[in-house]
């Protein structure tokens, strides 16, 4: 599944004496082996395209990324397609290096409520972005991703220390968590969100593999990923009637 493993042959050379033709024979042997080695490397380079360091960007915004108060959204990061147009991948696996994201979230009051003092209450709430690694991606019987409540127990848990449910820890784990606590008097406010998580380092490499059954299935979406998909969970919790609209750009650095 990953890079091919090569077996290195070994040879032991034992000196038994010297001959005036020995140097010539050794030179001939080295030349012959070197020629074979070069031919093997040339054929290998023609068969296996070189994997390149690339970056694929995805913008998540629009009606599908608008949440009313006390709701959550689950989605995923698209991976590169198999093909020749960059950003692409040339094999059925890639090495994930780093995921960066940056964007804005717009919080709006949906209805103007007035308290006893004749003033509108503050918009108070917690907005969260959770990056989750799915070790063995596959859709549930309903054909959907796991919901926020299924993965973390309940949306209210975003107020505290968020953790994956014990029964799902073998498959999922949190890679990055961003939380913004809001308390504003305005009916509309904008907040900046930004983060980065390192997926591979000098001691550990994270690889993702794909189910490339046919040409149409090599598109890098969640159903195409066989190992280590990246999921994104958005959650907006507030007691005030409001909504959160996100516009977030994700940059995935990879080798593929």
UniProtKB/Swiss-Prot annotation:
Which Pfam families does the UniProt entry name for this protein?
A: Gemini_coat (PF00844)
Q: Where is this region: Interaction with Arabidopsis thaliana NSI protein?
A: 150-187
GO MF, any single term = single-stranded DNA binding
State the span of motif (Nuclear localization signal). Answer: 81-96
Its main subcellular localisation, reduced to a broad class, is host cell
Q: Which key words tag this protein in UniProt? A: DNA-binding, Host cell membrane, Host cytoplasm, Host membrane, Host nucleus, Host-virus interaction, Membrane, Transport, Viral movement protein
Which BP terms from GO are recorded? DNA transport; transport of virus in host, cell to cell
One GO CC term on file: viral capsid
How does the entry describe its membrane topology?
A: Peripheral membrane protein
Q: Where in the cell is it found?
A: Host nucleus; Host cytoplasm; Host cell membrane
Q: Which family does it belong to?
A: Belongs to the begomovirus nuclear shuttle protein family.
Protein name per the record: Nuclear shuttle protein
Q: What is the native source organism of this protein?
A: Bean golden yellow mosaic virus (isolate Puerto Rico) (BGYMV)
The top of its lineage is: Viruses, Monodnaviria, Shotokuvirae, Cressdnaviricota, Repensiviricetes
